């Protein structure tokens, strides 16, 4: 969820997403996206000429109820629900369906997880509740940091974070998470950096610096 971080006024932002999604679908790759709080609030998203998946399904999952997408050739079931409104206070995951038998079950959810006071109380739930669903992997969105909330013996519960740090407070590598699944539905995942700009902290000794211009000179020499 949250394809865009807030509202966007340049139509090229949305068209860029449409173009890249079309490339995936054109290559036979299924795309499943849930609307997060920013997507739900952004009226422009619903007006985009979005491509359909190879099987004819929409790339956005339903806002009305939890939806399951079955990728039969891959043995994968994807469960998720989009935000209907920006401020979603209900525990959406509580109504997600039981895992599909004999398939690798992925839950996708836009949430801050219960108890998170920094990123907003969106679709609150706990890692224990997600674990009890019996899915094989949880892909979470909303928080811009990569985090793993896996409980011992349970499935990975992973925030991939955002693809690109937006400012100095979002430091370190940013990217996506690639999940590999074997024939027994055991999975392993790794972080794949995709950012093009990083914001490293920089310490400058200003004791002998007399003006702002000198700060810039010292910074550029580092």
Task: List the predicted regions and their residue ranges.
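Short, conserved active-site loops that position catalytic residues or coordinate cofactors/metal ions
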Residues: 1-2
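His/Asp/Glu-rich metal-coordinating catalytic cores
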Residues: 7-188
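C-terminal functional module detector
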Residues: 168-222
């Amino acid at each position: 969820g949250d394809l865009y971080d807030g509202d966007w006024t340049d139509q090229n932002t949305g068209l860029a997403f449409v173009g890249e999604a079309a490339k995936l679908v054109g290559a036979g790759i299924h795309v499943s996206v849930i609307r997060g709080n920013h997507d739900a609030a952004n009226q422009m998203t619903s007006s985009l000429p979005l491509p359909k998946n190879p099987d004819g399904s929409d790339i956005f999952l339903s806002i009305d109820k939890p939806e399951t997408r079955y990728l039969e050739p891959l043995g994968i079931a994807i469960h998720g629900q989009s935000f209907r409104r920006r401020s979603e206070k209900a525990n959406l995951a509580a109504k997600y369906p039981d895992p599909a038998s004999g398939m690798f079950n992925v839950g996708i959810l836009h949430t801050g997880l219960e108890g998170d006071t920094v990123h907003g109380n969106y679709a609150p739930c706990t890692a224990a509740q997600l674990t009890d669903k019996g899915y094989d992997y949880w892909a979470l969105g909303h928080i811009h940091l990569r985090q793993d909330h896996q409980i011992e013996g349970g499935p990975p519960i992973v925030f991939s974070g955002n693809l690109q740090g937006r400012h100095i407070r979002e430091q370190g590598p940013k990217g996506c998470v690639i999940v590999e699944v074997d024939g027994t539905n055991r999975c392993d995942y790794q972080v794949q950096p995709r950012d093009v700009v990083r914001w490293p902290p920089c310490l400058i000794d200003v004791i002998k610096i007399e003006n702002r211009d000198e700060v810039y000179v010292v910074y550029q020499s580092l």
